[in-house]
Amino acid sequence: MTQLKKLYRKLSSLPAIAGLLLISASWAWTQAPAQPPQTDTATKPGASQPEQDQKRATGNASTQEQKISSKEAEELFRDVDDILRFASKDSGLPIKKEVKRRLTSRDEVVAYLEKTMAEDKDAQRLRRSELVLKKFGLLPRDFDLQTFLVALLREQVAGYYDMKTKTVNLLDWIDIEQQRPVLAHELTHALQDQSFGLEKWMKEGDNDLENKKQPTGMDIENDEISEARQAVVEGQAMVVLVDYMLAPTGQSLLASPQIVNALKEGMLVGTADSPEFKDAPVFLKEELTFPYRYGLDFETELLRTGGKEKAFAATLSNPPRTTRQIMEPKTYLSGESLEPMRLPDFERDFKNYERFDVGAIGEFDVAILVDQYAGTEASHNFYPHWRGGYYYAARPKGDPSAPLALLYVSRWASREKAAAFAAIYAQSLDKRYKHVHAVAQEGKDTLDDLQKLESLSGTHTWLTEEGPVVIDVKADSVLITESLDQPTTEQLEQELFGAFVATGK
């Protein structure tokens, strides 16, 4: 559906995002149930100014920003070892070496993150992501993704564990009481790193199709590995964070489902002090919080069914491969294997086009798309029926200003679900294009009133200001092309759906 994978991989390479982007949205909750375990602490200069502390915790810069004292910094440095021991006991992951620690300023962190973003090899992927996302209607056409991310970094920057230097970075502008639960989360990453080599472990799932001339069905199947692994890493860290916050009450994550639900709800809402996140498009909120929300649910289910060993070390040794396995842990536990998707001959079929992007459209991607165009309830009822999907984006050769052309193929659990998804996608056209007109077909009603559609079968075409949109539904599969010339669309239909046409299915 977009380069979703590559967009998230790009974001997750930034430590502050991978660390605690969403934690700032849950400060209200983390302060409510209990104070975290702690050593004796001196009174903080900012303790009588909770509103200011809250603002600092979410990362909003202020000309009056207060710094923690040298005594508080020393105390926080000592706390690292205590919290590391808690994280080790809670996760079962051993402490193999001391974790380096460093106190850093907001300016240093922001400069580091901006440098990482500018130099990262995925910078071009990010720009491609933006255009494909806009084609699917998941970002407004005038939205500047790069500007948004820079602003978000400044707003949401938080403490983080740096996998390259093996150092946990503590922040000199956030009250130490608020940094302790952050440390529980980040030191879990340090433990993961010590046992499994986190940077290499994540790269093993970094499956980029950009340089493959002819991706295979297995390539598409493996295209979500990085998201699934990120959800495991963040889900485990969230388990430890929740248990750390609940420890003074004698409770734990498994015994407090209502608290977990409240935390997850808060992740998507943000706070009054996080305007960039609060005002972000739905897609970005969902995408940025996916590994935390769904990762937490995934790990909770593994804890419930298999205990600590299964939820932590065993899952890091044998990680899930798709967002479907994260969203539906039973599919991971049962070892479900879906048949790879059939792919066309991209080089031949798109001989008149320059490839722009290609990738999987997984269960989570579909959940966001359906949520945006049919609502959250419909999304929750719909995404479990996903059985595969991919997209291919291209531009006509010699015409870089031409609209982005798109092929999207999806497979569903039944004919009925395929027909229902096709209708939802057709309904999105009115929201994504200024002018949409159904092409009359002999013997068929003209589908101009898209919002009345409940299901769609057969082949249908609409004209838009960016060219034709074709939706072809055959059995349990849906083929969609946008801004693609008719001969290419017909060739793709014949290649992928020829067997259905021949048998009349």
Regions found by a protein language model. Give the residues of each.
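C-terminal soluble interaction/assembly domains
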Residues: 389-505
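Compositionally biased, proline/threonine/alanine/serine-rich low-complexity intrinsically disordered stretches
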Residues: 29-74, 505
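Acidic helix-start/capping segments at beta-turn-to-alpha-helix junctions
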Residues: 96-117, 204-214, 254-265, 319-321
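Catalytic Zn2+-binding segment of zinc metalloproteases
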Residues: 187-203
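Auxiliary, metal-adjacent structural segments of Zn-dependent hydrolase domains
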Residues: 77-168, 172-177
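Bacterial N-terminal signal peptides
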Residues: 15-26
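Short pre-active-site segment immediately N-terminal to the catalytic Zn-binding motif
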Residues: 168-184, 225-228
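Pan-zinc metallopeptidase signature
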Residues: 254, 263-403, 409
